[in-house]
Amino acid sequence: MLDPNYVTGFVDGEGCFAITISRIRFKVAEVRLKFEIELREDDELILKEIQKVLGCGSIYRLEYERYKKWRPHVKYQVGSLRDIKEKVIPFFKKYPPQAKKKKQFELFCIVAEMMDQKKHLTKEGIEEIFSLREALKMHKDSLDARDEHVQWGVE
């Protein structure tokens, strides 16, 4: 089994604590949390080992046929809020990210707590999640280059 500190270091470089807000019927917003790591297909073994350490999630194959020079990829993803709250967050609180994923993880935890309290189901809660995004922009220097490192897709 992989050393937990190795997993955290790997995630600091390759992982993503994603928060997405999608518009669904009747202009209601839906908030989702996902923990993801995407690698080239030949690195699938490391994703399987991380999956064992965390004890949750799925691994998917991705084909990028439209990009001729791209190789197939694999993605490890945890999308279950229960697994995120009971496995992913406790793991990374015990072995916290130290580099560019630190702020992303902190924000991820705040939004997970809001979801646990059902705040994401209210207009005020959605507005608070958007304002957290703006606050994160002010911490760019503690992150990486020009990217907030949080997926904020409005679908």
Where are these regions (language model features)?
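Sequence-level preference for short, compositionally simple segments enriched
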Residues: M1-E155
